[in-house]
C-alpha cells in the first residue's frame, strides 16, 4: 500500500519517517511563520497528497513540539478524495511566540483505516451497564 505526494513548490519536503516503525510520516513547513503565543496559525506544506482508498490521513502533533514547546495540531483529517494543498493548523499554548522555519518538522501524518457501516435509525439503543453516564463516570 502506498500513498502519493505531489510537491507544489520547491520549498516542499516529501514526508519522512523517523524510523522504520514510526507510526507517522513527518510533515515539514514550506514557509516561515510565527505561531503566536496563545494563538494559532495555518502552516503551508506545499504538498498535495492522495492517501489509499479505505484510509484517511490524520495530522497529529509531534511529541517533542508538544512536550517542550506546547505546540499542538488541530482540524487534522485528510480524506482519501481530497487533492488540495495540505496545511497544518498549529496551536501554541505557551506564553512565548514560536518561530517556524522552512524545513522544520511541524506535525506527523498517520494513515488510518476507515470503517463505513450504514447508519440505522432506531427508536432506542440497547441498554448497557454504563448507560448514559458520561464524563468521569468510570473513574478519574
From Swiss-Prot:
Pfam families: dUTPase
UniProt keywords, alphabetically: Hydrolase, Magnesium, Metal-binding, Nucleotide metabolism
One Gene Ontology cellular component: nucleus
Keyword Hydrolase listed: yes
SUPFAM superfamilies referenced in this protein's UniProt entry, alphabetically: dUTPase-like
GO biological process: dITP catabolic process; dUMP biosynthetic process; dUTP catabolic process
EC number: 3.6.1.23
Catalyses which reaction(s): dUTP + H2O = dUMP + diphosphate + H(+)
Annotated GO MF terms: dITP diphosphatase activity; dUTP diphosphatase activity; magnesium ion binding
Entry cofactors: Mg(2+)
Top-level taxonomic group: Eukaryota
List of residues binding substrate: 62-64, 76-79, 130, 135-136
Listed pathway(s): Pyrimidine metabolism; dUMP biosynthesis; dUMP from dCTP (dUTP route): step 2/2
Role: This enzyme is involved in nucleotide metabolism: it produces dUMP, the immediate precursor of thymidine nucleotides and it decreases the intracellular concentration of dUTP so that uracil cannot be incorporated into DNA.
Family from the record: Belongs to the dUTPase family.
Complex and partners: Homotrimer.
PANTHER family xref list: DEOXYURIDINE 5'-TRIPHOSPHATE NUCLEOTIDOHYDROLASE (PTHR11241:SF0)
Name under which the protein is recorded: Probable deoxyuridine 5'-triphosphate nucleotidohydrolase
Amino acid at each position: 500500500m502506498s500513498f502519493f505526494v505531489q510537491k507544489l513548490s520547491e520549498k516542499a519536503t516529501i514526508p519522512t519517517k523517523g524510523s522504520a516503525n514510526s507510526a507517522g510520516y513527518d510533515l515539514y513547513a514550506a514557509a516561515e511563520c510565527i505561531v503566536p503565543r496563545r494563538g494559532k496559525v495555518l502552516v503551508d506544506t506545499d504538498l498535495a497528497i492522495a492517501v489509499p482508498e479505505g484510509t484517511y490521513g490524520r495530522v497529529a502533533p509531534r511529541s517533542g513540539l508538544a512536550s517542550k514547546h506546547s505546540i499542538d495540531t488541530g482540524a487534522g483529517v485528510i480524506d482519501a478524495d481530497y487533492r488540495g494543498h495540505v496545511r497544518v493548523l498549529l496551536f501554541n499554548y505557551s506564553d512565548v511566540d514560536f518561530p517556524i522555519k522552512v524545513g522544520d518538522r511541524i506535525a506527523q501524518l498517520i494513515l488510518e483505516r476507515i470503517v463505513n457501516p450504514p447508519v440505522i435509525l432506531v427508536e432506542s439503543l440497547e441498554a448497557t451497564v454504563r448507560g448514559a453516564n458520561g464524563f468521569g463516570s468510570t473513574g478519574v
